[in-house]
From Swiss-Prot:
Listed name of the protein: Uncharacterized protein in mprR 3'region
Top-level EC class: oxidoreductase
Molecular functions per Gene Ontology: NAD binding; oxidoreductase activity
Source taxon at top rank: Bacteria
Gene3D superfamilies: NAD(P)-binding Rossmann-like Domain
Record family assignment: Belongs to the D-isomer specific 2-hydroxyacid dehydrogenase family.
Chain positions recorded as NAD(+) binding sites: H112, I113, V191, G192, R193, D217, H241, S242, A243, G244
Organism: Streptomyces coelicolor
Active-site residues per Swiss-Prot or TrEMBL entry: R193, E222, H241
Keyword Oxidoreductase among record annotations: yes
Disulfide bonds: none
Amino acid sequence: ITGAEGGAPDAPLVLVGAHPAARLRGDPRVRWFHSVNAGVDALLDGGWPAGVLLTRTVGRMGERIGQYALAWVLADCQGVPGHLARTAAPPGAANPPNWPRGQTALVYGTGHIGTAVASRLGAAGLHTVGVGRAEHAPGGPFDERITAGEDGPWLGRARFVVDALPLTDATRDFFADARLSALRGATFLNVGRGATVSLPALGRALAAGHVRGAVLDVLTDEPPAPGHPVWELPRTTLTSHSAGITAGTDITADFRACWEALRAGQAPELAVRVGRGY
């Protein structure tokens, strides 16, 4: 492994970072770029050089995001938002707890993160329905698996909807009026990518009561500036992209795993399928 500075002028380069330096894009010496992030949509904007391996860091992100989702689901079931509101205002009637067991959670995205979310929610007794690509194998922690085209009957039955989607052309504004207006009082959590949700549509669904409340860890514009429309959304909590923070140990462990796979002549599990977008 050599860096961009020093070494033989034509030595192959293996780079680790958030974005390759502009002057290295298109450099024929670059053979492999390992992203320190799980999301790679920004890297793929404008195309990716042919013949350059792109891998990503997942680490323990699924575990952390799964715990985050479970925390907010349980908080909702126990009426924590209402308790907090009553603490800051004159006392009112408390709502009874809404137990998680047997309630339905639609988890969009059945990769590392969605699988970890389903595992935690299932352990708490929720009925988890994974919404993913048709070629994904059945099984895992999901009670049921469907494709995006089959979610219609489930939208009105879901108590929780968790967005763990990557950002691709197919998932941009995936949650727009059609899906959000079909909900019947579900709580919506976004732990995937901000641009998979239309904020105007979410605002309309909140105002109409289709969405009971929203927890948004990711946004298209981060951090949102004062006056950004997201601050006006009712019954919405923002958590500043903190659900699945990547640690340095995650980066080194995943890079090492990719390196060992390549040494063994195998494709790394964390290799990005550029044509698919993740």
